[in-house]
Amino acid sequence: MRKTLLALLPAVVFLLGTVTAQAEETSRSFTDDLGRSVSIPAKPKRIVTLHDIDLTIPLIELGVTPVGSHGRMGTDGKPYLRSSAILTGVDFDNSDIAYIGSINADLEAIVALKPDLILTEPDRPTPIEKLEQIAPTVAIDNTKDGAPHIYKMLAELTGTEERLAVLDRRYRAQIDALKASVDTGTITVSVFQPLNGKISVYHTYRALGRVLRDAGFRFPAIIHAIPEGDRIEISAERLPELDADIIFDPYRSDTGTSPQAEIDMMEAVMPGFCDFLKACRNDRYILLPREEAISNSYAALSLMVSAVQSHLTVRPSTEK
């Protein structure tokens, strides 16, 4: 009997090793931006995302469609993924993505989707403690190096590094083309928008800001002083500090707001604001759709490269 057991021992050890290896293949450890070590599926199949612009759109660009996503509620009472229809062609109404709420996530809706991975951000109002009771939950900080960090994390989570490399290669080629046509190092640029009676200014305004920085444009000192990933609000009296050769003002386009409405809001902040800005007096105050400018997606980056290049390339002149 003992000889028989000894003879079977190698086979038992082999089987145990196989089971262990299979378990390791189906899950792995991942450290998120809160420093938490999370056991996640090696190949997640049912992902729920808690932010449309920062998480859902990048996932779609990487070729991964989540089963559920945070979204916004339109004036028609229908949910939508902000900027997604413009940038990816995908929205709730033409995909299998389920709407799981806007500001506060609908936990019951998430449970019903049977996710194997939940993606959130550190500042989302739905507590991670509640989410991780449903499925492994990873927090990705959108203020930590912006889009490059988000995409790197998502690609690692979903095994889509090759797709990310292609997207990034295309963007780098577009930046090189922009720099070849515009002497970016000699041009100062500024990006801001009116908000709640003040002027909102980011260190790097999402896709638009990243394009401007990657292309080598210069910024006013007040913008340089803002910590990376942060923003400030200033009073109208400091508006001249934001002057530059070119000013970009992203207007809210998803709600049907017009560029003129953005100008009216600036007038409300400071009547006759254009008189205080050299860029505005020289017809270099450019309004761009916020839906494209504020996204973290590569599609938005491409659109912003084209927009910046079209406004700044040399034009024919009638002056002698």
Q: Can you say where each PLM-predicted feature lies in the sequence?
A:
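Proline-aspartate-enriched helix->loop->beta-strand connector
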Residues: 107, 111-120, 136, 239, ...
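Basic- and aromatic-lined ligand-binding clefts that recognize polyanionic substrates
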Residues: 46-50, 54-59, 166-222, 229
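A short, structured surface patch at a secondary-structure boundary
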Residues: 53-107
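Structured C-terminal subdomain patch of bacterial secreted/periplasmic proteins
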Residues: 181, 245-320
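Bacterial N-terminal signal peptides
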Residues: 7-17
